[in-house]
Amino acid sequence: NSAHPCCDPVTCKPKRGEHCISGPCCRNCKFLSPGTICKKARGDDMNDYCTGISSDCPRNPWKD
């Protein structure tokens, strides 16, 4: 999406100096800090946390 403020309209990748375009661990073109909750626990589930190096929300490795 060339109209996105984080996206370089030519490459469709994050603009220079920006980390990401979208995702649960991306806000204002930057990765969220490590340890930021990106998916809250439900039932017996545990919270999932941002890594600080990706816009994805990784699954908690301690889940069964």
Curated annotation (Swiss-Prot):
The main location class comes to secreted
Describe the location of the Disintegrin domain by residue ranges: 1-64
**Cellular location(s):** Secreted
Q: Where is the signal peptide?
A: none
Q: In which tissues is it expressed?
A: Expressed by the venom gland.
What domain of life does the UniProt record list for this protein's source?
Answer: Eukaryota
UniProt keyword annotation of Transcription regulation present: no
Under SMART domains, the record lists:
DISIN
Q: Where is this motif: Cell attachment site?
A: 42-44
Sorted UniProt keywords: Cell adhesion impairing toxin, Disulfide bond, Hemostasis impairing toxin, Platelet aggregation inhibiting toxin, Secreted, Toxin
Record keywords: Disulfide bond included? yes
- Any S-S bridges, and between which cysteines? C6-C29, C20-C26, C25-C50, C38-C57
Q: Name one GO cellular component term.
A: extracellular region
| Gene Ontology MF terms | toxin activity
Family per similarity comment: Belongs to the disintegrin family. Dimeric disintegrin subfamily.
Indicate the quaternary assembly.
Heterodimer with subunit alpha; disulfide-linked.
The UniProt entry, under PANTHER family, shows: ADAM A DISINTEGRIN AND METALLOPROTEASE DOMAIN, ADAM METALLOPROTEASE
Function comment: Inhibits ADP-induced human platelet aggregation. Antagonist of alpha-IIb/beta-3 (ITGA2B/ITGB3).
Which protein is depicted?
Answer: Disintegrin CV-11-beta
Q: What is the lineage of its organism?
A: Eukaryota, Metazoa, Chordata, Craniata, Vertebrata
